Amino acid sequence: MNKIIYILLIAFAFGSCSEYQKALKSDDLAVKTKLAADYYESGKYKKTIALLEQASPSLRGKPNAEKIFYMLSKSYYETEQYYLAGYAFESFASNYPKSEKREEAAFLGAKCFYTKSPRYSLDQTDTYKALEKLQSFIDTYPKSDYMPMANVLVKELTDKLEKKAFEIAKQYNSIAEYYRDFNAPIKVLDIFLADYPGTKYKEDALYYKFDTLYQYALNSVDSKKQERLTNAKMAYETLIKFRSDTKYKDTADKQLVEIERELTQYSNN
């Protein structure tokens, strides 16, 4: 009995394979699209793609084109071909503005760009592109059921950009004394704090700004030292005002003692 079932399964598999190969070689668009739809419904997306990529160029403007291009776009998505899926969904949404699938296509297209966003340490061109696509979706469909997920994706991407900006500012601080360039890290930290006023890295950024100003003051010529020591002291006060129990307090307090000791020579003049 088991042997019979095994033989039948093999025969069915060969029959299915033969049907697929015949459809690929066929010039009949109806044969290709019918079998592609069957494969799509059964989750065989790679075969769906192979058939529809052959058929789709000849179907533009035809009555069933909308369905075909949606299936092709979704098949790209399901097989994680996100670049192809992103542009396919974008094209679908543009070409079929009245389609009931347009909203879904717009969201999935934007999500495809999100999937290509790299880790924060790499170039973020794709992250900015994904944010642009997601924001466009949010503006177009403010009441969409996809809105909660769209907002989650936007937050994740903006958090990534925030972390990258912070790490760049932090790196500037770490090399400031070595290169004797203190203005650059101060400017970068100021830009970061202005761009991300509610950042979770604010305590860190405020300390790094203070630390940079502290280094700047101690490495200054006498004619500019007093002013820079005063600026460093003000940065310390800003840090403590933001968080009196800052994790940097022990280090910052020691730096402040040195700043005040340096300032005494000017108060005695």
Show the residue positions of the predicted features:
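Hydrophobic core
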Residues: 12-14
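Acidic, polar-rich low-complexity tracts and alpha-helical solenoid repeat scaffolds
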Residues: 5, 16-269
